[in-house]
Amino acid sequence: MEIISKSKEERDIYLIPPNFISEGSLFGGMLKLRNAIEAVVFSLGIAVPVLKIAAFSFTTKIIILCLTALPIGIFALIGVGGESLTAFLINFFHFLRARRIVSAETTCVSDEKRTDKHLFPDIGDLPEEFDEEERVSVRKKRKKRQPAEADFFPVEKIENGICYLKDKRYIKIMQIEPINFLLRSAREQRNIIYSYMSYLQISPVKMQIKVISKKADIGSHLQKIQNDIAQEKNEKCKILLMDYYNLIRRIGLKEAVTRRFFMVLEYEPMPGGSKKNEEKEAIAQLHIAEQTARTYLRQCGNEVIEQEKPEEFMAELFYILLNRKKSNSVGFVENAAEAVDEYFLAVDKTDKIEIPISSLVMPKEIKFQKGSYIEIDGLYYACFMIPSDGYKSQVAAGWLSLLVNVGEGIDVDIFLNKEPKDKAQFRLGQQIRINRSKMKETSDTNTDFDEIDSAIRSGYYLKEGLANNQDFYYMNILITITADSVEELEWRSNEMKKLMVSQDLQMKPCYFRQEQAFLSTLPLNKMEKGLYALSKRNVLTSGVSGCYPYVSFEMSDDNGILLGVNRYNNSLIIVDIFNSKIYKNANMAILGTSGAGKTFTLQLMAMRLREKNVQVFILAPLKGHEFRRACHNIDGEFIQISPASHHCINIMEIRKTDQKANICLDGDQRAERSELAAKIQRLHIFFSLLIPDMSHEERQLLDEALIKTYALKGITHQNASLYQQDGSYKP
């Protein structure tokens, strides 16, 4: 294994080697060969005409060259954003040509013109049949013309649990439940990484992992609180529940953030397969891939969420990604109903039409007019990438949690592309030989000696990993930042850059490639070629597993109580300690310094558990008085046991044990025992604690006295004697 580990309890370190040099370069990779050629061409292209001008003196020509050819040559030699100058200029002019506003409005004749105006001024003099024919022709033209959004959105349809793309690909989108990876011990983390590595060995060739952070959807939790309010009979508890409802709603709208994790798998056609049955094969293969991912990720502790309506789930995901602001107030189903109504208004209802998926998920307009950001429905998007040389060579397990849990409005997309092993081994061997030959010709005093040596070490590391049955991957990471204004977008971008620099990482904006980057961030498992070349980083299976991404600090249970807001990622902490599927038991320990709020936390939990109709008992020997006010405010019972108190415990009281749970599990098979005998047995234990040196004769006399005492109240070994005629317990 290519893992640095000193002991079983220390965190493992995983290696992400630098890219071995796969293209022409000079000085051991310091300068790209293409940049050097362009610098020479541009410099000569300016210098030759200037030198041929006879009207200028030689000194004047030198000054002109220093002001023109020299800076352009240096600029071309360095490049722009990791690209050559010509590539940057080509991309810039392509952006100028392609910048536009993608709108949902069609270029067809509007409804007002179609319904209120005739096609000809003198249409009234023509027969009705002619008018109807013209109307039919207009409808046919309208059906042929598609809105700009239909051309922009790359999904053709969503059926059979998969997405059909316009480029004839088939993909499957799955949602994965994260785990709190960083709270696990080093041994547990190692086991999770090994399980994830096992899945990577059999995973598809291309994979996309998408992490979305957005405002938390607290609708289901609020609905449960409303149900509790309707069922609550105590008026004081109803008031508390209303306050709790308003608190959840206020925090959820302003502070609460949630994260969703998705995996996108792509159908891989078999070589030489038939195109006729490709759709059926794609459906079957993607279903098998989903089951495989579910099995292996369960070993890691993650669960693949089973979707009752996978088509609606995938359409809703696209709707959320393309309508972030609108989706907070208008759900997908409601928006789809409105879109269907609007679509039917534009066509004849008698025509048999198929509504495109773009009409259900696309926003009203997308503005691709700026080179550094995109505007969608009043929200601003900026896409960034981690360049090929922007990674740390040594990373800890789960290091991507830094990006995943950074805050609201930060999305992360990870692309994994598995290369053929034989092809990778051939290229590695070839490049190692080239670098070794360069090493022989280079003196150890040259500046490029260390670069070549690093490339050789990286090549040998990758070659050794491939020999140890690991796979060769190219990994790309895109980061999307969203904000409500340009100023906020710039502030978030600068803060994110500072965070990346503090962790020895780099982040570069996708200048004039925002449209391509935005399309790449959609869950379509396809990255634009230019961005792929600029951000790809070679890594082995062990390095990919070290980038385990399904990490979250959230604790948001369905039927829990609110404890607060996580200060690190602004997620709501809603805990249901009685959920045995998540927690091994319902025990808790509250630790903190004096004045940290231990008593307040305990009181808060008790109040909110009572609001959930959970009976709560608090034993507080020293600080019982601090719970008195809260107890009285919800009509609870405050019992003070002390020499001066009027409260006392009746140790002689008998209450029948509730056997409903045992009967539900085992049936009514157990013989009914005497509750009186069980109570007398417990009383013997109580008196033995008071009188430790009690003799056997005294125990027998005590037993007879207890039986006679209960008999005076009409209680015998028959359990029916515990009740009065109305069914209540005897006092």
Predicted features by range, described:
Residues 47-70, 74-77, 583:
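Hydrophobic alpha-helical transmembrane segments
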Residues 1-19:
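Short, charged cytosolic
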